[in-house]
Amino acid sequence: MTYISEIKGRSGKDHIDSVLKRSGPLIGASVVPAATLETWTGVLPDILIDFWRNHGLGALQGGLMRLCVPDEFDGLLCEVFQADKDFSHKDCHVIGYGPFGNLIVWSTRHWIVRIDLLHGRVSASGLTDPSKKHNENASIVAHLLGHQPDSLNVVDDDDKKMFKPAVSALGPLKTGQAFGFFPALAMGGAPQIANLKTVPAMEHFLLLAQLKQFQLVDYLGNSPSNLRPIG
């Protein structure tokens, strides 16, 4: 195994091993082709390339975080960002997504960007508070590989987490799949298991992106604060 990354003098391997020990093994792992690794080396942080090279793509956190290659998401980011001055599909790359429509994006300008397709929110702490940008590799470990799973889950009307009940009702998600609410929450749908279906992730995410005017938000307290519209 070859590793090129390090964080504060420690090999990226140590950090990746710690992530896998906490979150469990990668689910449904697939090999990343050498050409893909070459394309994204120097664009994405080294520790993510190390993960791809040595472990591949798949799902972490019991299926809550799906790692992906960014290429197929360019059209989705165009739909979300429109002509925004701070965000563009040209320098923002989807590197992971949750089962209900939360995207983890790497921006070469702002580093980690989060997109909540269900609620039309974009957050980028590296933009709203640049002092939080310290180390690219550490940022990937904290916000992607070691991501807190609850932020990718959704809750029902009784404030109960829905991912595990959704898996029990509909089965585990395969690569390229997501859970979608019908009708969509933006169209008055309710967050209930009875309203969930297993859907093609990209197709459904594009639909969600067309239903909302996205807002740049900041999470300074318990709830997001709108800063400005995206676009």
Predicted features by range, described:
Residues 1-113, 169-231:
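A surface-exposed partner-binding patch
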Residues 47-50, 122, 158:
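Generic low-polarity alpha-helical segments
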Residues 113-154:
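Compact, glycine/acidic-enriched structural inserts
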Residues 150-165:
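Low-complexity, serine/threonine/proline-enriched polar segments
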